[in-house]
Amino acid sequence: MSESELQTMVADYLRFQYPDVMFHSDFGSGIKLTPGQASKQKRQNGGKRAWPDMFIAEPKMQIQHAIVYGLFIELKKDGTRLTKRTGEWATEHIAEQADVLDRLRFRGYEAQFAVGFDEAKNLIDKYLGGKS
């Protein structure tokens, strides 16, 4: 299954299981673009090619009364290794994505990698607390 097919499955799950939850999926992230299209997309995204694939715009209270403003998910297809045996990120691109996720967490969002549909579903269900 491609990353773009995974995004579609996760979006379908959200629409079915949590119909009132607002979310945005970056459909273009898994699609091969021409050099011109890629350049235009990069300019439109502020030069940030490591932006997460999905955002769930549902704030929630955490322990100690802190608000988490929403959930960003960087989706990876099944079988993707995020790290090497040494603990380093597997690729430069994954390292860039991890940096963006860290920066989003610092700003009050939950931000995680999810490898495969089951991991994404579990992350979403845990974040939304089973509300539908």
Question: What does each model-identified segment do?
Answer:
Residues 1-132:
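Catalytic phosphate/metal-binding cores of nucleic-acid and nucleotide-processing enzymes, i.e., regions
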